[in-house]
């Protein structure tokens, strides 16, 4: 029978090597596990054929395929000869597949495998055998290692505590070797006495090799939770922190990586590291040059500083901000830059660390990384820059950063756009150089496009609108910026933001932007056509009613709604209407909305800024005779006369101007009395002004200039409004620093004023306007 012949052939091939096979297994510390007794057994053939490798195929087809696979042709006799060779070496092929270690070196066995991607049947059958063999080997090795370690640990513990340092060194080396194998490593970590001895030896030794071996052992143990707990309970953290002062790089590496594993996975490790002085030691290591070592060290600092103010202050006191900024400026290793930017991000929300990072050049060091291909690095740098930017408005050398931020506004990543808009908003605050730079690199167009794309995402639209508000005021390119918003189709979307679902912070910023846009006469008609005036009046009425309701209920403190005071909305809307009222058609619309009674009522406001803008808008409306009569009919003369005595020069000036225009049709006696009243009120603190007025030269028609408002005025106050929201890591919000009120322009025409004696000299004698006082509309620090 063919199958029996095959089995006999296999048995004859295996017989001579049977003892060698058994011997080989015994040399590997194995006993005979049944391989010898089962050497001559095999499963019967399922096909019943003599040669299990043969297939029932057509011979001619085989010959055809054979010829296709070789460049030379074979005769029938040659094919039979080759087939015979394969039959004679069948046993060797089986042995090579299942027990390759039993073959003699150099033995050549013809292979039946023609395609490396398709193993033969014998090779496939041999795979489970090989897997079983390796499993048995691993199991026996593991058992041997565990038994050896268990027997050796008590003795090694004694040797580690020996007084002879040579003995201690040898024991440390042996323990280190044992810790490299998993079984013995588990045995070590389960012995508190051994772990304590390792920690004590590492801490007390003066021998470099002993320190290296003990630190290496703890490093190996720290890859297991059980090992981390054993190190923690044995007081390993203070010892490892001490090793951070070692001059040996390998010891430093073992110590910092072990501490890193503890900080990541062991409860209580953070506090232990802080108490042991680990923060100071880690900051001191930031001057090293090994980038991988620095990456681990900075990650440790991030873990320790996150959510812990005391740690942030310790890092600051240790010189951390400067060292971290130097790393960002010096290295290119992505992981190091990423871990360092994470530390800076955590520190950037600390009010003490923030200015230190900025002064160390943090803005300039982080900026170049915004074009890095690593998105995680870019995102961390953006968050950090966003948090730092409100403290960096006075920084120089920001041109490159500003250009990059404008480019990033076109990103498809919402987080990138959000951060870029926020940073631009803060950096353009009260910095005319930054404003001009952003305008010159296409910032207006980019910001308008950003607002258009953002839709109702206020975390993007609010900072973008704030940035536009800054860019349209108080710098040489401001008029160009005011025009550019219109030319890039921004007016419709800006006016739309005054409507729901916009929240009060966004509405406040939009009102300020509209006020600035109205400084450009070319924007008057488009803003009117977009319905800006009725909506501003609606917002004004609503905010005023809210303040009146609160006052009637006995409230004394100003109320915040979504972080915005309603008094700010009253002031902002009135100021925007004041500038829009420079256009005659806009004045008609404003008067037609029955706003004059409200403006007159605002003259009684206890807030000087509201008094000023109310008087300002009445001043513009009073240019029209009908409006002047309506103002007088509402009883405005009394409050305006009272405001002539205001300590705020802007309020007094506007009140005087309204009274001028209201007196146009009055008798001459009335005009003379008014002239005397104005003279005594406006020049009460300057008795010699009448003789000096010719040289003072107030330019009443200067667009956007403020009227007589000095910084030492008690009404010149600052406040903070909330930023654009906090991030998921507890980031502090960006602070938008703003002044309490803006300062209305004074470019109303004076040609039509009646002759009031010295009236023109009176107007010329006022202090010149300060163009840097438009505070409500451009955030001031």
From Swiss-Prot:
GO terms for biological process: acinar cell differentiation; adherens junction assembly; adherens junction organization; animal organ development; anterior/posterior axis specification; apoptotic signaling pathway; astrocyte-dopaminergic neuron signaling; bicellular tight junction assembly. Pfam families: Arm. The modification Phosphotyrosine is found at residues 64, 142, 331, 333. The modification Phosphoserine is found at residues 23, 29, 33, 37, 45, 191, 246, 552, 675. It is found in: Cytoplasm; Nucleus; Cytoplasm, Cytoskeleton; Cell junction, Adherens junction. Residues 2-23 are annotated as: Interaction with VCL. Residues 34-57, 720-781 are annotated as: Disordered. Transmembrane segments: none annotated. The keyword DNA repair does not apply. The modification N6-acetyllysine is found at residue 49. The modification S-nitrosocysteine is found at residue 619. Key downstream component of the canonical Wnt signaling pathway. In the absence of Wnt, forms a complex with AXIN1, AXIN2, APC, CSNK1A1 and GSK3B that promotes phosphorylation on N-terminal Ser and Thr residues and ubiquitination of CTNNB1 via BTRC and its subsequent degradation by the proteasome. In the presence of Wnt ligand, CTNNB1 is not ubiquitinated and accumulates in the nucleus, where it acts as a coactivator for transcription factors of the TCF/LEF family, leading to activate Wnt responsive genes. Also acts as a coactivator for other transcription factors, such as NR5A2. This is Catenin beta-1. The gene is Ctnnb1.
